[in-house]
Swiss-Prot record:
Domain ABC transporter as annotated: residue spans: 626-853, 1219-1449
Superkingdom in the source lineage: Eukaryota
UniProtKB keywords: ATP-binding, Cell membrane, Glycoprotein, Membrane, Nucleotide-binding, Repeat, Transmembrane, Transmembrane helix, Transport
Protein name (database record): ABC multidrug transporter B
Family annotation (InterPro entries): AAA+_ATPase (IPR003593), ABC1_TM_dom (IPR011527), ABC1_TM_sf (IPR036640), ABC_transporter-like_ATP-bd (IPR003439), ABC_transporter-like_CS (IPR017871), ABC_transporter_C-like (IPR050173), ABCC_6TM_D1 (IPR044746), ABCC_6TM_D2 (IPR044726)
Organism name: Aspergillus fumigatus (strain ATCC MYA-4609 / CBS 101355 / FGSC A1100 / Af293) (Neosartorya fumigata)
Every ABC transmembrane type-1 domain range: 283-561, 933-1182
Family statement: Belongs to the ABC transporter superfamily. ABCC family. Conjugate transporter (TC 3.A.1.208) subfamily.
Membrane-topology descriptor: Multi-pass membrane protein
Induction details: Expression is induced upon voriconazole treatment.
Function: Pleiotropic ABC efflux transporter that may be involved in A.fumigatus adaptation to azoles such as vorizonazole.
């Protein structure tokens, strides 16, 4: 060509950044200058820029690793590398060297750089527990670069000097390889003392982390044994819940809460670095994804090129490129997902901790355990799901943009068509997103209502069974479930719509685009332009456009859903904190206020009495422990106050009793003292915040008796023995099979009422607090036990007196008033009508004087317990060893669960085969068009469109059928089975099973089945069929590639066998480890008043952190092993791709370009599909555990109903009320008898009182009548019918019962009175009127008012339950200590109602107040589960030495003395 410059020589080209020509080293090489600057100086420069900052960071750290042989080996290797590089620099400076203009400078800089890196290596070794990330990355990449450079130097060497340079460069490559090995060696075995305890991941190097090798020990353990949480790796310090909470809470406190997404923003800010750490691997993954169509395009061109040295070199380069791209994709995918899940774990740890912390600071009215639990389960799960794809939002957007750009290069203006399809799909998705948050919120609210009612049911199982309300509760709760599922359908429709939009681009974009391309080319007269290369490159780009779009649609939907959950949690966090209106002291004591004149008795004698008694306590009581000055208290400041104008002073170390009629506000006053009730006016001041509290209904956590008593205090053996003795628990421990190691169950369900009350008392006493507040804490005890416990604790030598505690007791009974230093009387209006000592109040006349009480008679000093005896095994028995039932399905799995879902999918996979057939159809179309341009275009395009349309239609129909119809049906079925299992379970099950574990199945498991499992199931099965179809197509296209498939299948089989044996166990552990967390959360909220009174919030928050960390271990590791699976399967894809390209290179000329296109296109599609498959399958595998757990629960929890209990009973049974116990022995659990050989006959219409000391078996006898304990022998007949042969529900619905603990169901007054909806409104009103509650209920809004808004006191609740009993049919009434917790007036009302409304009934009454049963026809005395005496009460009283007379004498001793 005229005027053109001559071609450059190889030496000249090496002095530029250009790629050498074909004549220079085959044209397959870099120029030397490029290798020196770009591949040599650039990476070193980056490292040298970072190195000073890293050195500075390491300088301030303490040494963590000992200077072992490894350090000296590294130093030696680095110095050797520097010396060799120095020699190399000298040789490059010699005149004979064929160098570039940068050779001398580049080698000199590299030499200096190596010595600097030697210094960095020493610092990294000594002051970091992990191998250096920076040095490993540098050595890895520059090793590959140096290999390329060494090849160049050997190819261009033309003299001795050049050959020596090539040899020295080869030596540096060898030393770098050695250094890479040395720097990658982990330092776990050479850590200094005090630096041990790191989990494997925390000390793993880059290669270990990149390929998840640190998980191998876990896989070995999971493969060989049943795993427990304790077998799992500990969390590293960055995942500590306490640390995460501190980070998040600090930011939360600083920012204004004006935006509803504030919590989301501060979460992003708090965990920005972990979140951003996933950006580089995600960006690399996007870049590597788009190397695939470029490689495909080049491979198709290569398949048609002639065979020569140049093309052979290109072939080898393609093999190397495939290896790098596909392995790189696997590593970057694994790392980006792992970093994302690590961030999710951090968010979960921080947000759950914030929910708990906030819940512990709420007022009593706002502390709804079920609502908070929904946030911790359903909403946190939505956040976890939403953040899994958070990086896919920007990553997929970038990939879509790249795909559009590359499509434009391939198809020209025709690319507008698929872009238009993608845009329509995206806009449609964005429109639906605007509805997602609102519809999800409504659904979650419905879940919250159901869980709240379920939690209420679980806490009241004894009452539900006793009243025979199983059917009513089943109907009510299942109705809430059906309502919830119906509401969820609105959200599910959005899900189906979004899935359809996501698949639109994948199915229709290729059809429209190739049709448009062909039309444009035909109009330009280029019919032959549609060839193999264009077809398959375009199809690969369509895949890379459609899959990111599908992923983007799903990512947007889940992330928007997570935003809604963040908003719900933020709304919870923004609730007002509990405000403590009390004034607390700045120092130990202060002078009391002057008493304010009001309707009080000025009692100068009270001080004298207290002063006299202070002699025995040894401490001054002239300073007040509590002063209330003109204070008004209201639960709702906008409504009428409950307590008004109170002025009370309570001396330190004194014993004060608060009394008054039922509903006067005694409990409210105690809670006001605890700071739980808002103070509208006046003030309340405490001398100490060291307070113990025992509530009217005892609160317990699910723990052993000892743990319940010691609670958050430290264990003191002697003090513990004293407290146990004083609370009369020694005999109970002797009777219990495990002594004080007996687990009491959720809410103390395994205990009798008296035992529960005394354990709560023991906890209050054991804490040794300055102020002890007891809310009617002695009422649930029999007379003898009550007298003993009272004098042991409050008597002149009582434990509380000895430690000088100020004792404040609210009581419905007046019998202990003579012992009080001070008495405070509240009237019905909430005013303090009287205040002073008994003597002064008796003299003044009024409420107290009406009881006619005299001076007290203090008991002599109670015998001290034998601490040695209490510590012996006979009392404190350890748990008996129980065999752990290991479920082998945890390792091996249960295929039937998956088969169930495969059957649910039906014919949906057919669409997938049709969709994937389009690849072969395009091949046939392209071949036909090459042979006969525009010959049968309409035919091929029409069939192509038909395949896509049929596939799309079947997808929509299949998804709709499953998501809208089948999933709700299965969800309804699972709930019905689960609820039926719980309602049919025996009482022993609830005593042995934590309520949180049961509730977890109703919340977490059902939520996963409803929300996550359907999507995971559809996507998994769809993508599985795609993968199988693509493998078949690859085999058809390349018979040689098909040879490798058996090896691939064997590899995948081996992988899944190793993986599933561990993953299934982690899946179970993940779900099970949440149960203790949920139980703790629920327990703490139920006992919030007690916990705040004791000041245990910090200790329980620590426990919450521990339980959260405990649950985080399987949660985090489950996601980690899923990433291991992703990486491993990506390596299988890489192997397939490399095998295919090797065959293309080696068999070039024997394989057609069409077959190459089909095979390589399906490798790209397969790689995309396998990633989706792993994502979807791991989600499915995680969520299917919920079905396994529910099915296991329903199969393993035995029903209390026996096959023999099938006899029918007449409609009017029991018609008389004759009851006969025939040699009855009963037990809650095998070998733990509670009744022994009880024989008893009760005639129709008789009124029988059952008495005995606490724990004697009274309640168990009653429970046997309701068939709530199992009869080991004997039988019970009612009106001649053997109740052991009729259904238990039938018995309970025919016998009328009122228990000690009032049963109030969530809902309206009407629903509580008539759960089955059987009675007219008039009958309900009459029943309520008969107990004197109708006026109060009417004032609050009538029968349809929610019962929680009526604020019934304990006594009023008991009256309400008696009113409910009036409505129920049957001739047998059972009263289980029904009047033990009420005051004298309420007791009088109840006795009147019983006499008037149940005069024709047979009545069995368990009584602690023996005076209430003196007019009964018969009394039965129990001891140790046996009837020791029965007969007419008057006759037994007059019989000297009878059990009943002794019991009665003990209960009435005080009255007789007075």
């Amino acid at each position: 060509m005229t005027g053109s410059s001559p071609p450059l020589s190889c030496q000249q080209v090496d002095n530029t950044l250009h790629i050498p020509a074909l004549s220079c080293r085959g044209g397959f090489d870099f120029s030397l200058l490029f290798e020196e600057l770009i591949l040599g100086i650039l990476p070193l420069g980056i490292v040298l820029i970072i190195a000073p900052f890293r050195l500075y960071h390491l300088f301030w750290r303490q040494a963590k690793v000992v200077a072992s042989w490894l350090l000296w080996a590294k130093i030696t290797a680095w110095l050797a590398l520097g010396i060799v590089q120095l020699v190399l620099a000298v040789y490059w400076a010699r005149p004979a060297a064929t160098r570039t203009q940068a050779s001398i400078a580049a080698n000199a800089i590299i030499t200096v750089g190596f010595f600097i890196l030697c210094l960095l290596s020493c610092a990294e070794h000594l002051r970091s527990t992990t191998p250096s990330f920076l040095l490993n990355i540098y050595l890895l990449f520059t090793l590959l670069f140096d290999i390329a450079k060494t090849r160049t130097l050997w190819l261009r060497s033309s003299g001795q000097t050049d050959e020596t340079i090539a040899i020295l460069t080869s030596v540096t490559v060898g030393i770098k390889f050695l250094l890479l090995i040395l720097e990658a060696v982990e330092k776990r075995h050479i850590l200094r003392k005090g630096q041990s305890g790191y989990p494997p991941e925390a000390t793993a190097g880059i290669f270990n982390r990149s390929f998840f090798l640190w998980l191998n020990p876990l896989f070995r353990s999971g493969f060989s044994k049943i795993l427990d949480v304790e077998d799992l790796f500990d969390l590293d310090k960055h995942l500590s819940s306490r640390r995460l909470y501190s980070t998040l809470e600090t930011l939360w406190d600083k920012v204004p809460k004006k935006n509803p997404n504030t919590l989301l923003f501060i979460s992003l800010k708090a965990f920005k670095w972990p979140l951003l750490s996933a950006v580089p691997p995600r960006a690399c993954l996007a870049a590597l994804n788009f190397c695939q169509p470029l490689l495909l395009h080049r491979s198709l061109a290569f398949a048609t090129e002639p065979v020569n040295n140049h093309t052979n070199s290109i072939g080898y380069g393609l093999i190397g490129a495939y290896i790098l791209v596909y392995i790189g994709m696997g590593v970057t995918m694994g790392q980006y997902q792992h970093m994302t899940y690590r961030t999710i774990t951090m968010v979960r740890g921080g947000v759950v901790s914030m929910i708990y912390n906030k819940a512990s600071r709420l007022g009593i009215k706002d502390a709804d355990p079920a609502a908070s639990l929904t946030l911790m389960s359903a909403d946190i799960e939505r956040i976890v799901q939403g953040w899994q794809t958070i990086h896919d939002i920007w990553g997929n957007a970038a990939e879509i943009a790249l795909a559009i750009y590359l499509l434009e290069r391939e198809l020209g203006v025709a690319c507008v068509v698929p872009v238009g399809v993608a845009l329509v799909a995206l806009i449609g998705c964005l429109i639906t997103l605007s509805f997602v948050v609102a519809r999800q919120a409504v659904w979650l609210e419905a879940i919250e209502r159901r869980i709240s009612s379920t939690a209420s049911m679980l806490s009241s199982m004894k009452g539900i069974k006793m009243l025979g309300l199983k059917s009513a509760i089943m109907k009510s709760l299942h109705g809430l479930r059906l309502e919830e599922l119906e509401i969820s359908k609105k959200f599910r429709r959005l899900l189906v719509w979004n899935m359809a939009l996501g698949w639109t681009t994948r199915i229709f974009a290729p059809i429209f685009a190739l049709g448009a391309f062909y039309g444009i080319m035909h109009s330009r007269g280029k019919d032959s332009a549609f060839d193999m290369s264009t077809a398959y490159t375009s199809l690969s780009l369509f895949a890379l456009l459609a899959d990111p779009l599908l992923s983007l649609v799903m990512a947007l939907m889940t992330f928007v859903g997570s935003i809604g959950s963040f908003s719900r949690i933020q709304e919870f966090l923004e609730k007002d904190d509990h405000v403590d209106c009390r004034l607390k002291p700045l120092h130990a004591s202060y002078e009391s206020f002057e008493p304010k004149a009001m309707v009080l008795v000025d009692d100068s004698d009270a001080t004298e009495t207290a002063s006299d008694r202070s002699i025995h306590r040894g401490k001054s009581v002239y300073h007040d422990a509590l002063t209330v000055k003109n204070a008004t208290f209201a639960w709702n400041v906008e409504k009428e106050p409950v307590l008004k104008g109170l002025t009370i002073s309570i001396a330190r170390g004194s014993f004060t009793m608060i009394v008054g009629p039922s509903g006067c506000g005694k409990s409210t006053l105690l809670k006001a003292i605890l700071g739980e009730v808002p103070c509208v006016n006046g003030e309340i001041r405490l001398s100490s915040d060291s307070i113990a509290f025992c509530d009217q209904i005892p609160w317990h956590m699910n723990a052993t008796i000892r743990e319940s008593i010691v609670a958050m205090s430290s264990f003191d053996k002697e003090w513990y023995a004293s407290v146990v003795h004083a609370c009369g628990l020694v005999q109970d421990f002797e009777q219990l099979p495990r002594g004080d190691e007996t687990v009491i169950g959720s809410k103390g369900i395994a205990l009798s009422g008296g035992q529960s009350q005394r354990i709560a008392l023991a906890r209050a006493v054991y804490a040794r607090k300055d102020i002890v507040i007891l809310d009617d804490a002695f009422s649930g005890l029999d007379a003898a036990t009550e007298d003993y416990v009272f004098h042991s604790l409050v008597g002149i030598h009582g434990l509380l007196r000895k430690i000088n505690s100020t004792i404040i007791v609210a009581s419905s009974s007046a019998k202990r008033l003579p012992y009080a230093d001070q008495i405070v009387v509240l009237d019905k209006m909430g005013y303090a009508s009287e205040q002073g000592s008994l003597k002064a109040l008796n003299a003044a006349g009024g409420y107290v004087s009406s009881f006619g009480l005299g001076s007290p008679e203090w008991k002599s000093e109670i015998d001290k317990p034998s601490v040695t005896d209490l510590a012996q095994p006979k009392i404190l028995r350890p748990n008996r060893t129980e065999a752990i039932k290991e479920d082998p399905r945890r390792q091996s799995g249960d295929l039937s669960i998956y088969l169930y879902y495969i059957r649910s999918i039906g014919w949906l996979p057919t669409r997938l085969v049709l969709t994937d057939m389009t690849g072969i159809w395009v091949k046939w179309w392209a071949i036909s068009n090459e042979e006969d341009p525009n010959g049968r275009t309409g035919y091929y395009l029409g069939i192509y469109a038909m395949l896509g349309a049929v596939g799309m239609l079947s997808l929509i129909i299949g998804c709709w059928e499953m998501v809208i119809n089948m999933v709700p049906k299965s969800g309804e079925s699972f709930h019905r089975k689960l609820l039926a299992t719980v309602l049919n379970a025996p009482m022993s099950f609830f005593a042995a099973t934590d309520s949180g574990s049961i509730l977890n199945r109703f919340s977490q498991d059902l939520q996963l089945i409803d929300m996550e499992l359907p999507v995971a199931a559809i996507n998994t099965f769809a993508t599985l069929i795609l993968c199988l179809a693509q493998m078949i197509l690859m085999g058809i296209a390349s018979r040689y590639a098909a040879i490798s498939f058996p090896l691939v299948i064997l590899a995948v089989y081996s992988i899944q066998k190793v993986y599933l044996r561990t993953s299934r166990q982690l899946r179970f552990l993940d779900l099970e480890a949440k149960a203790p967390l949920y139980s703790h959360f629920s327990d703490c909220l139920n006992g919030l008043v007690t916990l705040r009174a004791f000041g245990w919030q910090p200790a329980l928050e620590d426990k919450n952190f521990q339980l959260l960390d405990y649950s985080q271990r399987p949660f985090y590791l489950l996601y980690a092993i899923q990433r291991w699976l992703t990486l491993t399967l990506d390596m299988v894809v890489a192997a397939i791709a490399v095998i295919l390209i090797v065959l293309v290179v080696t068999l070039r000329g024997t394989i057609s370009a069409g077959d190459v296109g089909v095979a390589l296109l399906n490798v790209i599609l397969f790689s995309q599909s396998i990633k989706l498959l792993v994502t979807f399958w791991t989600n499915l595998e995680t969520h299917i555990g919920s079905i396994v757990r529910i099915r296991s629960f329903t199969e393993t929890v035995s029903s209390e109903n026996l096959p023999t209990e099938k006899d029918d009973v007449p409609p009017n049974w029991p018609w008389g009320g004759d009851i006969e116990f025939k040699s009855v022995s009963a037990e809650y659990r095998p070998s733990e008898p509670v009744l022994g050989d009880v024989s008893l006959t009760i005639k129709s219409g008789e009124k029988v009182g059952i008495c005995g000391r606490t724990g004697s078996g009274k309640t168990s006898l009653i429970m046997s009548l309701f068939r709530m304990v199992e009869l080991s022998s004997g039988s019970i007949h009612i009106d001649g019918v053997d109740i052991t042969k009729i259904p238990r529900q039938e018995i309970r619905s025919r016998i009328n019962g009122v228990s000690q603990s009032p049963l109030l169901i969530k809902g309206s007054i009407r629903r509580n009175m008539d759960p089955n909806g059987s009675y007219a409104e008039k009958a309900i009103i009459e029943a309520i009127k008969s107990v004197g509650l109708y006026t109060k209920i009417q004032e609050k809004g009538g029968l349809d008012t929610d019962i929680s808004e009526v604020f019934l006191s304990q006594g009023q609740q008991q009256l309400f339950c008696l009113a409910r009993a009036i409505l129920r049919p049957g001739k047998v009434l059972v009263l289980d200590e029904a009047t033990s917790n009420v005051d004298a007036k309420t007791d009088e009302i109840m006795q009147r109602v019983i006499r008037e409304k149940f005069c024709t009934h047979t009545i069995l009454a368990v009584a602690h107040k023996l005076e209430t049963i003196l007019d009964y026809d018969k009394v039965v005395v129990l001891d140790a589960g046996r009837v020791v005496e029965s007969g007419d009460p008057c006759t037994l009283l007059s019989t000297e030495g009878s059990y009943f007379s002794r019991l009665y004498a003990s209960s009435m001793a005080l009255a007789e003395e007075q």
